[in-house]
């Protein structure tokens, strides 16, 4: 009958509704259960990634054997800065963690082709800051990370975090602020009250400890020099060098077989470069590179060297570097003996210990007709490269503007090279910017 049919339809409809409600409840329970399980899985993955990303840069390997230098980066920052927002900088340097290489630089708190770039030939001001960006990129407000307030600086990575050292303050009482993972961890006060200053290149890390060299005192006479050992951004030991008649400024330091070697600038009376090497307990040795292939600028023509300071043209100087290989040495230097122009790498197979001026390899980096500037060393650890040795690298600052050119500003770009045991080439990789800029006219 019609009534029976309606009853059956009603029962079926009721059963479907009950089934639908059960289905919704089960689905909701499954989703809630999954949500409750997502967080611990996500946390586990996050912790695992952090564990993988943190290592100790041992620094126990020797420098890699090399035959020459392969171009690694060029930032073209002055060329780009004629139109784009690029910082006015000087004293750029490169440092690498086990994951990346970064360019560090001292800004002037100003952009190229802007009114605040006026007068930036000055070295020390309260506006100068240490910042960093990925290597090879032009330093701009859009890709750069603030590191420290500084007119002299250093930075390095121990495998866990970045250590930065930024010196700022008055000439007669500056303070170095140490930061680890971005947080202030320690300070070092000027002990001679005469322009405390440091490397302007990377510090060196071995087995979780990082090392730097600082200078305090005259730039044209006997000063005071200290080595500092730091762990997680705190000074754990320091030693003042007993180095009469030596002058150390702006040291370029690197690890080699668990020890540290630094090659520095003698601004007092040496046209060859002084060095200091030390172990992790800060037991040190000192000397000058003996080679008759002189590494500073200004300098005399190559001739007979000395294992002490070479006096002719010894006053003043420029930051530089060398890499020691046994009794041999790779010497980086300007091509011009009296101006900061050109750059070349020279292999002197006995130059660390012998005074003759013979060499076996010369590789051109920048032509003598183009400006260069400071240069310094950095290394790539096996944890970054996958090699079984520490790769030696260097950067060259290409200074433009004042005092040599008709601009209102002073700034620079940079290039870098790394040592390889394969084919390389001589060429010139200059800054290449056309000056003056609009702001200069």
Swiss-Prot record:
GO terms for biological process: carbohydrate metabolic process; viral budding from plasma membrane. Residues 3-25 are annotated as: Involved in apical transport and lipid raft association. Ca(2+) binds at residues 266, 270, 296. One of its GO terms (molecular function) is exo-alpha-sialidase activity. Residues 26-441 are virion surface. HAMAP family: INFV_NRAM (MF_04071). It is found in: Virion membrane; Host apical cell membrane. The active site is at residues 123, 374. This is Neuraminidase. It catalyses: Hydrolysis of alpha-(2->3)-, alpha-(2->6)-, alpha-(2->8)- glycosidic linkages of terminal sialic acid residues in oligosaccharides, glycoproteins, glycolipids, colominic acid and synthetic substrates. Its EC number is 3.2.1.18. Belongs to the glycosyl hydrolase 34 family. Residues 28-62 are annotated as: Hypervariable stalk region. Residues 63-441 are annotated as: Head of neuraminidase. It comes from Influenza A virus (strain A/Goose/Guangxi/345/2005 H5N1 genotype G). The lineage of its organism: Viruses, Riboviria, Orthornavirae, Negarnaviricota, Polyploviricotina. The influenza A genome consist of 8 RNA segments. Genetic variation of hemagglutinin and/or neuraminidase genes results in the emergence of new influenza strains. The mechanism of variation can be the result of point mutations or the result of genetic reassortment between segments of two different strains. GO terms for cellular component: host cell plasma membrane; membrane; virion membrane. Homotetramer. Inhibited by the neuraminidase inhibitors zanamivir (Relenza) and oseltamivir (Tamiflu). These drugs interfere with the release of progeny virus from infected cells and are effective against all influenza strains. Resistance to neuraminidase inhibitors is quite rare. It is an enzyme of class 3 (hydrolase).
